[in-house]
A protein has these predicted regions:
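Charged DNA-binding/catalytic regions of mobile-element recombinases
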Residues: 1-154
Length: 154
């Protein structure tokens, strides 16, 4: 059907409908030079495939040093495990000036953005579908999966 350009008559599922209270923030890193630690942090979530499901891994990384400041595993993608990771990183290293994430529901949620605002952090978000805006943590996921997850099974 796809090759012929045909569409089914049933409605397609809408799995990613943003909630009205989830605000999208502008991307602040377009023309900024990173010159010191704690200037810009980023966060992202990836999934780790298992024999019977997935685990979700969130990591927070400093853009200057490329160091993972905090990480957590969870069997659900709720916002609380992300907020706990943020609390750990801020508790150990102090708040950054700018925090960059994608537009995932965990990072646009009230709990996440409120925690950053309370710490006086400027919020930056990648453009929709622009994975290169958060390239350092995406590279971390690639290295982690190919070196530690996929490779042992080859």
């Amino acid at each position: 059907m796809r090759l012929m350009g045909l569409m089914p008559i049933y409605r397609q599922p809408r799995t990613s409908v943003p909630a009205k209270e989830h605000r999208i923030y502008p991307y602040l890193l377009r023309s900024i030079s990173i010159e010191r630690p704690n200037q810009v942090w980023c966060a992202d979530i990836t999934y780790i495939p298992l024999a019977k499901g997935f685990l979700y891994l969130v990591a927070i990384m400093d853009w200057w040093s490329r160091k993972v400041l905090a990480w957590r595993l969870s069997n659900t993608m709720d916002v609380q495990f992300c907020v706990d990771t943020l609390d750990e990183a801020v508790g150990r290293f102090g708040p950054p000036e700018i925090f960059n994430t994608d537009q995932g529901s965990q990072f646009t949620s009230w709990a996440w953005t409120q925690r950053l605002k309370e710490a006086g952090v400027r919020i930056s978000m990648d453009g929709r579908g622009r994975f290169l805006d958060n390239i350092f943590i995406e590279r971390l996921w690639r290295s982690l999966k190919y070196e530690c997850i996929y490779l042992p099974f080859v």
